[in-house]
Amino acid sequence: MADPLQHKGAAKTSRIPIKIVPQERQRLPPWIRAKAPSLPNVGRLKGILREAKLHTVCEEASCPNLGECFGHGTATFMILGDLCTRRCPFCDVGHGTPLPPDADEPRHLAETIALMALKYVVITSVDRDDLRDGGAGHFAECIAAVREKSPATRIEILTPDFRGRLDKALAALDRAPPDVMNHNLETVPRLYKAARPGADYAHSLKLLQDFRTRHPDIPTKSGLMLGLGETDDEILEVMRDLRAHGVDMLTLGQYLQPSRHHLAVLRFVTPERFAQFEQEALAMGFRHAACGPMVRSSYHADQQAAAAAAG
């Protein structure tokens, strides 16, 4: 079957409700520095992933930490293809009509994780609004396959919102729940129309709360990117909403514009302010908070989960 058409950059954002005025990316402040890739390890890991026909969000979303994570032989695996059914203008993953789920992907994923001897993995996906359960059943199949091959490996999932199919999705995840459930709110509710067309703030909170109700012993986690025009008070209000919905773990990081056709960065939050947010999060009762310019939801996820469990 031929590869489907992938829209990125201007082709992706041209049909969303707001108009993106192309802007050159701002000069980065001195505190934002990604580590240069360790080329032998990066090439080796990419080779393993391509041979297994797997994708990583590290590559598809142009994550600034790719060099560091690949250099350590770790990655966040992206299942269900590399085409998203939505057009979020902050994200660098391509938009298009995806292929049906690959029935061999759970096996390929499990074999690759076993080959790499990973102790902690993050599994994420694009939005799959074309599937009746939003892809949750495929998540469960992947979790079960990994556990069969690597029973000691801990598994975190970073899910889409399963909007319009939440009950089906949660029922599917009941078959093979993860060790950590992560779903990112991404930004404050005032900015949802601009940053997350097709998503709903209250629905995302409900997903996290409903999963927690069904699996009270499994930690829940969420994250936001800062720099899209939100205020500090709005961030604190979202943090309070997350705690009110039983979320245990928090990540806050700096939004970086993938290209001139994506949403512009409106401010760079200082490391000192991130440190204050982290202290405020812990005071609210989060079991763990990772807040910093280069923090991403799956960055050092194993360390976050271990710290939360110890706390």
Swiss-Prot record:
Record text on cofactor binding: Binds 2 [4Fe-4S] clusters per subunit. One cluster is coordinated with 3 cysteines and an exchangeable S-adenosyl-L-methionine.
Transmembrane segments: none
Catalytic activity of the protein: [[Fe-S] cluster scaffold protein carrying a second [4Fe-4S](2+) cluster] + N(6)-octanoyl-L-lysyl-[protein] + 2 oxidized [2Fe-2S]-[ferredoxin] + 2 S-adenosyl-L-methionine + 4 H(+) = [[Fe-S] cluster scaffold protein] + N(6)-[(R)-dihydrolipoyl]-L-lysyl-[protein] + 4 Fe(3+) + 2 hydrogen sulfide + 2 5'-deoxyadenosine + 2 L-methionine + 2 reduced [2Fe-2S]-[ferredoxin]
Residues covered by the Radical SAM core domain: 70-287
Cofactor(s) essential for the protein: [4Fe-4S] cluster
Annotated metabolic or biological route of this protein: Protein modification; protein lipoylation via endogenous pathway; protein N(6)-(lipoyl)lysine from octanoyl-[acyl-carrier-protein]: step 2/2
Cystine residue pairs: none
Compartment(s): Cytoplasm
CDD domains attached to this UniProt entry: Radical_SAM (cd01335)
Binding site for [4Fe-4S] cluster 1: 58, 63, 69, 298
Coiled-coil intervals, chain numbering: none
GO cellular component terms, A-Z: cytoplasm
PANTHER family: LIPOYL SYNTHASE, LIPOYL SYNTHASE, MITOCHONDRIAL
UniProt-recorded name of the protein: Lipoyl synthase
Native source species: Thiobacillus denitrificans (strain ATCC 25259 / T1)
Gene that this polypeptide is encoded by: lipA
